[in-house]
Amino acid sequence: NLNYKNEKQIEFHRKELLKIYESCCLENTVPFEGIIELLEEINSSGLAWGIVTNKPIKFAKRIVDHFLSQYKPNFLVCPESTGERKPNPAGLVKACKLVNSKPSLSYYIGDHLIDIQAGKRAKMITIAAAYGYIPPGQSPLDWNAEYIAETPIQIKSFIPELSK
């Protein structure tokens, strides 16, 4: 347990880190290889899609606007949208409501254990992105996702509307 003094110090350093990140959040940021092709196929299929992230909205919106706006995500749900962070499923449930989709018929793709936990708690079909930012010592094989994708393009084979 942290005492109040330590929590205060942590919050101070977190705010300082976010100031630095704000000035450089687009540097060295690129979509994973194959993501653009996947998004083009999703858009062609007519499926709704979007992003649920733990990233604060001011950073997430900037990144999405810069890299993905032409692919027209249907939603961007950040912690400010629900007051909760993953693994709490509130953001995923909200995303499904925004596109009038039942969670049980919706897919959630994540590159972290908490993403898959949130998807499971929301009763969604989960896909672990093994090509993502996997923390050292973790394996998507241990996350109990319904599917594991080694590449973005492999995701198509798990979604019937895309595998035709």
What are the functions of these language-model segments?
Residues 1, 14-19, 48-54, 111-115:
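Short, mixed-charge, low-aromatic patches
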Residues 1-23, 33, 37, 41:
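A metal-dependent, Asp-based hydrolase signature
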Residues 2-5, 23, 27-30, 80-84, ...:
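Pocket-edge positions in alpha/beta enzyme catalytic cores
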Residues 5, 41-42, 95, 161:
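Low-complexity, intrinsically disordered/propeptide-like segments
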Residues 9, 28, 32, 71, ...:
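Secondary-structure transition/capping residues
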Residues 23-51, 57-65, 89:
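Short, acidic loop-to-helix structural element flanking the phosphoryl-transfer center
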Residues 56-164:
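Asp-based, Mg2+/Mn2+-dependent phosphohydrolase catalytic module
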